[in-house]
Amino acid sequence: SNASTWRVADINSGAASSNPGQYMEILVGDTLYFSASDGSSGDELWAHDTSNASTWQVADIRSGTGSSNPGQQMSILVGDTLYFSATDGSSGYELWAHDTSNSSTWRVADIQSGSGGSNPGQYMETLVGDTLYFSADDGSNGYELWAHDTSNASTWRVADIYSGSGNSNPGQYMEILVGDTL
């Protein structure tokens, strides 16, 4: 066998690192999606096509030099769509998506409206059928169990386990899926 190692891409040219995959890395077919920084647009969503060795920035979610840090709290593939946490700099960390079949990227939900972030998936993320379950903070009820139905694009709080503004932190210490029961 030919055991060799090579640099695939110099995303942040010069001596500085691009920190590829620091927050997320997901393979979809021949394409690897990951977080990286080119030194001018912060940590953003990038891709590398292994079939033709091309590398490109998929989305500059937080335009300018700031970082969106895609996948810092969560990243999961559902069909052809990547779901991940990211910040655009004005709404804090929220749930975002990228459709790999048509290259569109969008904020799925602004769970904690305003400049605060809901930090989706900080404690858990689990897919049951077409529904993504995750922890999030809406700014009023603390970290609770939330869901996003990928088939109809609806997002809702499943339960206020620790009623009031306290945090139940679902999934912080354990998450188990048995059949379709979380």
Task: Please identify what each model-predicted range represents.
Residues 1-182:
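Feature 14080 marks short, conserved micro-sites in well-ordered regions
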